């Protein structure tokens, strides 16, 4: 198989994640779906197998060559894995998942779905999630109907769903004018790579409707509320100096360059929480955050960021160097990028 096979085609940018692990960068996001009833693993596994027929470009695994990682078709059966919520851990792409670069798990009334960032982004993976959940509900006997929002079994796969969105930027140049030149950010060395101590997970839940209604009442977006609140907490814990907390924010490029692709198609922008925000009312901080985002999310700036990052990652992936050296170089590129800012949202 070659990368000309549309089922094996992936994007220019996210190949960088093939050369990283959980020890170098967060590359396996988790989606948590809370159900009304206890999850039925047999019906869930059946749903995953059905969804793979609709999303055949998700039937991937990765294998090393002397100079790079490459994708190949995965013909193994799909699996769903029991979670205990505490100690059981699985490795995506290993025998745990039969080599698949995504994971589906369950615990009591909760379904967990994770993916390796080299094959998708959050917006793209949501399409696969919707199909799995829709099929699961059907398999359980619920009278669900597709209102057109699900790429279900009543629709056909298109090669554009595995398109490399960044190819739309080829042979084009964009200006970096107006991109905020960030200063040194606040960091938290005690929770970075190599720090002693176990992983800390904190979960905060609330109705999205309440967040949406509040944000609308003061004329901002939900992100303009959530992001500064998280940065304020980070500043309270690790800041207190004249340095800003800076969060990395992923931006979906599909509204700018429409595509059906479920592959990785984002760029990142930097969002600060300035020291002077400490003395301002929250509403004012939220409004200033909205204004900053509006200024930094101009089309030209976003496409410049996207092309620069994708070109750099593609060049490294295609470089003729031993795999061990390429892994080391890719991990340095990734960790240097992440450590420029305080944390990633």
Identify the role of each PLM range.
Residues 30, 119-134, 212-224, 301-323:
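Short flexible/disordered coil segments
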Residues 132, 136-140, 234, 293, ...:
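Short, well-ordered alpha-helical segments in soluble proteins
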Residues 2-14, 110, 119-127, 131-213:
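Non-catalytic, low-complexity flexible loops and terminal extensions
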Residues 105-109:
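Elongated alpha-helical scaffolds
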Residues 1-68, 76-103, 236-345:
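Acyl-thioester-dependent acyl-group transfer interface
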């Amino acid at each position: 198989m070659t990368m000309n096979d549309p089922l094996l085609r992936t994007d220019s940018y996210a190949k960088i994640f093939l050369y990283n692990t959980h020890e170098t960068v967060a590359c396996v996001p988790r989606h948590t779906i809370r159900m009304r009833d206890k999850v039925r693993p047999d019906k869930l596994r059946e749903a995953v197998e059905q969804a793979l027929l609709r999303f055949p470009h998700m039937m991937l695994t990765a294998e090393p060559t002397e100079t790079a990682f490459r994708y190949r078709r995965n013909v193994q059966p799909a699996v769903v894995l029991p979670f205990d919520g505490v100690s059981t851990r699985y490795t995506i792409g290993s025998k745990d998942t039969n080599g698949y670069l995504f994971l589906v798990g369950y615990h009591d009334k909760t379904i967990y779905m994770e993916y390796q960032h080299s094959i998708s982004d959050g917006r793209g993976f949501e399409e696969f999630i919707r199909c799995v959940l829709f099929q699961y509900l059907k398999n359980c006997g619920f009278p669900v109907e597709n209102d057109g929002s699900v790429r279900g079994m009543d629709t056909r796969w298109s090669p554009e769903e595995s398109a490399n969105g960044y190819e739309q930027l080829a042979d084009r140049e964009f200006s970096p004018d107006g991109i905020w030149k960030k200063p040194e950010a606040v960091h938290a060395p005690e929770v970075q790579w190599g720090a002693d101590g176990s992983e800390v997970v904190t979960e905060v839940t609330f109705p999205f409707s309440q967040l949406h209604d509040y944000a609308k009442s003061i004329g901002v977006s939900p992100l303009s509320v959530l992001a500064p609140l998280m940065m304020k907490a980070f500043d309270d814990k690790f800041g207190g100096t004249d340095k800003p907390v800076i969060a990395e924010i992923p931006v979906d490029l599909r509204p700018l360059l429409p595509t059906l692709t479920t592959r990785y198609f984002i760029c990142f922008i930097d969002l600060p929480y300035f020291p002077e925000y400490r003395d301002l009312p929250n509403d004012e901080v939220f409004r200033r955050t909205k204004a900053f985002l509006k200024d930094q999310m101009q089309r030209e700036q976003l496409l410049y960021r996207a092309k620069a990052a994708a070109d750099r990652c593609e060049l490294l992936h295609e470089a003729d160097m031993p795999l061990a050296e390429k892994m080391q170089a890719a991990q340095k590129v990734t960790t240097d990028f992440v450590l420029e800012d305080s944390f990633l949202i």
